[in-house]
């Protein structure tokens, strides 16, 4: 399991421009991520997803996020997420630990 505090810093630096995590948070360029764990791709209510995201059909969890966050466009070809990915596995683990904590409160 990753480090939540390190993950929060990564989120602020690399994700917060497009995403929020708090319950009831607004969608930005990307969807609000609250409740992402256990949710299928393309299912955040009120956000307009590409068909690629809606049709991927996986459920978000630690393993799927680990793979997705390495290279989003490879994992879901056609996604509108323009983020290049996080190559370091330890940084992805930290970010996932933070997301698991922050999106469940």
Curated annotation (Swiss-Prot):
It comes from Aptenodytes patagonicus. PANTHER family: CYTOCHROME C. Belongs to the cytochrome c family. Electron carrier protein. The oxidized form of the cytochrome c heme group can accept an electron from the heme group of the cytochrome c1 subunit of cytochrome reductase. Cytochrome c then transfers this electron to the cytochrome oxidase complex, the final protein carrier in the mitochondrial electron-transport chain. GO terms for cellular component: mitochondrial intermembrane space. This is Cytochrome c. The gene is CYC. Heme c binds at residues 15, 18-19, 81. The modification N-acetylglycine is found at residue 2. InterPro entries: Cyt_c-like_dom, Cyt_c-like_dom_sf, Cyt_c_1A/1B. The keyword Aminoacyl-tRNA synthetase does not apply. It is found in: Mitochondrion intermembrane space.
